[in-house]
Amino acid sequence: MPVTNMSALANGHLEGAAHGASVSLIFDHSEPGQGPRLHRHPYDETWVVLEGDLTFQLHDDRLRVGPGDIVIAPAQAPHKFTNDGRARANLLCIHASPTFRTEWLE
């Protein structure tokens, strides 16, 4: 069973294909006011909010989330999030793909 320490990951990204896995992970650390631009993937993406307060946009819906919340974006759903809290937000992003594939929409 392969083991990878998070400190060895480039920018917190673990692409599953390089480790024989069918999923890829991002350990995201967003400072207040930060987050990715609107984008989508050809596979589902799931986030586990570990710390922080964020607003997710999924299609035209906006969702306020915090620690312990899990957000799921289906394949092809446009989405983004913003850390609108006062402290760093920490999330685990699970991509249902052995490689990252992103279409940036803005």
What are these regions (language model features)?
Residues 60-75:
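Short acidic-glycine-tyrosine-enriched beta hairpin
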Residues 20-23, 30-34, 51-53, 62, ...:
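Short, charged/polar surface micro-motifs in flexible loops or helix N-caps
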Residues 75-100:
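Ligand-binding loop in jelly-roll beta-barrel domains
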Residues 67, 82-83, 103-104:
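Short glycine-/acidic-enriched loop or helix-start segments at secondary-structure transitions
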Residues 1-23, 27, 37, 103-106:
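A short, N-terminal "cap"/entry segment at the start of jelly-roll beta-barrel domains
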Residues 46, 53-55, 62, 78, ...:
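Structural motif
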Residues 29-30, 40-56, 94:
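Short, conserved beta-strand element in jelly-roll/cupin
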